[in-house]
Amino acid sequence: MTTLQVEAAAVRDVSGTVYALAQPARHHNVLHLMHERGVKPDSSDWGQGFLLNNGRYVNRKQAAMVALRAGQIKNIPIENDRDYLLSEDLW
């Protein structure tokens, strides 16, 4: 059985389409890609998260738990009340 791991920064738009770029890309790189493809910004309805190695999109909080279980991070980075994952925490 393969251990779930966080593989890529991703953004899900209002229609549910997921845009992702492999590491070491960050979420701003994904947003730039979306802009290049003509996706109109509506950040209030976009979800920033990650793609897992099984292809599933998860939000930042879910990704933090996956990364912790997979040993990709040693603890959930709780600073300034942050309990979610940033790409900077991984790569």
What are these language model-derived features?
Residues 1-47, 52-91:
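Linear-motif-rich, low-complexity cytosolic tails and juxtamembrane regions
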